């Protein structure tokens, strides 16, 4: 995987695991708490995180979409101050708890520049949000195609769940990728669930990182 590190000589760290195909800049507007660094993880063609976490006193995790499944594997055994899931589950390719298998497989098999744009329109919901999302520097098409190919294969082989303890989950009421019903079904007995008005890409509704775990 790739990482983008924002080093403010902080004592604490926020670890953000992005969704598949999404630009790291999609969370750039969120204001960091005092004394925190930020590490953004993305491009999951492999699950190797080459970063020393041991220097930090507290680590908070925020994982979006496919990042929930990835974070569970990467952060097993790491002590977390909190773990927040946003519009994702630990079973991302699943008819009852994630994206239905046929839709996931179809997205991969039919992926083109054009269908990618349609997907991004679906995660944003309306035209204005989509146009704002398009201002983020887009990741190369070949890269996101390889990423989804790798993720699909890894997810079929590894269906373990509950590898880390999640403190809370956000569920967008109009999510067209991970349906709210499937998300609620997955998280109901696992952690506190907060439903929010919005689409799959919901970070535009927040101004501060801390609002994702303090509510």
Curated annotation (Swiss-Prot):
Entry-linked Pfam families: BioG
Protein name: Uncharacterized protein HI_1552
InterPro entries: BioG (IPR007398)
């Amino acid at each position: 995987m790739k990482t983008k590190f924002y080093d403010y000589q902080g004592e604490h760290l926020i670890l953000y695991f992005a969704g598949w195909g999404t630009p790291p800049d999609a969370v750039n507007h969120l204001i960091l708490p005092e004394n925190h660094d930020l590490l953004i993880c993305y491009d999951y063609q492999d699950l190797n995180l080459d970063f020393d976490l041991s220097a930090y006193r507290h680590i908070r995790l925020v994982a979006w979409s496919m990042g929930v499944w990835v974070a569970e594997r990467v952060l097993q055994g790491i002590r977390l101050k909190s773990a927040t899931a946003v519009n994702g589950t630990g079973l991302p390719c699943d008819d009852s708890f994630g994206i239905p298998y046929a839709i996931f497989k179809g997205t991969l098999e039919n992926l083109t520049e054009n269908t990618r744009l349609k997907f991004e329109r679906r995660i944003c919901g309306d035209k204005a949000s989509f146009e704002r999302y398009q201002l983020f520097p887009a990741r190369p098409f070949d890269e996101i195609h390889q990423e989804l190919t790798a993720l699909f294969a890894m997810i079929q082989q590894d269906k373990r769940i509950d590898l880390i303890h999640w403190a809370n989950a956000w569920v967008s009421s109009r999510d067209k990728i991970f349906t709210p019903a499937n998300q609620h079904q997955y998280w109901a007995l696992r952690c506190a669930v907060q439903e929010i008005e919005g689409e799959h890409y919901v970070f535009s509704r927040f101004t501060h990182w801390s609002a994702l775990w303090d509510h």
